[in-house]
């Protein structure tokens, strides 16, 4: 409950309590708050142990689905889709459908042939210094 309250927030609460309650009533208020938190913690622990005692082995069966729900609560939509619908295969999201040795350099994969009009055999330094043109897709317009 107070797991994400830092020292800065605690200092602000103490200073606010000092201003609101005053120095003579602040220690009593801190003692009362600590006692109330301790009583609540003891009550919750007692209720949990009472449930565990009454339910017996069924209590663990009840906790198992709750722990699975807790795991799902922290999951992103992409991770949930990957885990439950795609059995952990996230290649549809990453675009790496075949992670064989063809992705490694020097695998003997032939270069992609150039399509479209152009010089059949370009030679000399002019072929290496021409800038790469952006591909044009007439269907995209």
From Swiss-Prot:
Membrane topology of the entry: Single-pass membrane protein
GO biological process: protein transport by the Tat complex
Span list, region Disordered: 92-141
Top-level division of the source organism's lineage: Bacteria
Compartmental location: Cell membrane
InterPro entries documented for this protein: TatB
Transmembrane segments annotated in the record for this chain: 2-22
GO molecular function terms noted in the UniProt entry: protein transmembrane transporter activity
GO cellular component entries: TAT protein transport complex
Comp. bias regions, Low complexity: 117-141
Key words, A-Z: Cell membrane, Membrane, Protein transport, Translocation, Transmembrane, Transmembrane helix, Transport
Keyword Nucleus: no
The keyword Cytoplasm appears for this protein: no
UniProt main location, coarse: membrane
Main function: Part of the twin-arginine translocation (Tat) system that transports large folded proteins containing a characteristic twin-arginine motif in their signal peptide across membranes. Together with TatC, TatB is part of a receptor directly interacting with Tat signal peptides. TatB may form an oligomeric binding site that transiently accommodates folded Tat precursor proteins before their translocation.
UniProt similarity note: Belongs to the TatB family.
Quaternary structure (record): The Tat system comprises two distinct complexes: a TatABC complex, containing multiple copies of TatA, TatB and TatC subunits, and a separate TatA complex, containing only TatA subunits. Substrates initially bind to the TatABC complex, which probably triggers association of the separate TatA complex to form the active translocon.
Protein name: Sec-independent protein translocase protein TatB
Protein species of origin: Mycolicibacterium gilvum (strain PYR-GCK) (Mycobacterium gilvum (strain PYR-GCK))
Organism placement in taxonomy: Bacteria, Bacillati, Actinomycetota, Actinomycetes, Mycobacteriales
């Amino acid at each position: 409950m107070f797991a994400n309250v830092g020292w800065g927030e605690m200092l602000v609460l103490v200073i606010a309590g000092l201003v609101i309650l005053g120095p003579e009533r602040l220690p009593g208020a801190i003692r009362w708050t600590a006692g109330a938190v301790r009583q609540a913690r003891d009550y919750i622990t007692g209720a949990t142990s009472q449930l565990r005692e009454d339910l017996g082995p069924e209590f663990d069966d009840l906790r198992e689905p709750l722990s699975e729900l807790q795991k799902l609560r922290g999951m992103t939509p992409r991770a949930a889709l990957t885990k439950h619908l795609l059995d952990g295969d996230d290649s549809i999201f990453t675009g790496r459908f075949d992670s064989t040795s063809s992705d490694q350099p020097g695998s003997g994969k032939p270069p992609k042939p150039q399509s479209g009009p152009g010089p059949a055999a370009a030679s000399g330094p002019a072929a290496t210094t021409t800038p790469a043109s952006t591909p044009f897709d007439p269907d995209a317009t």
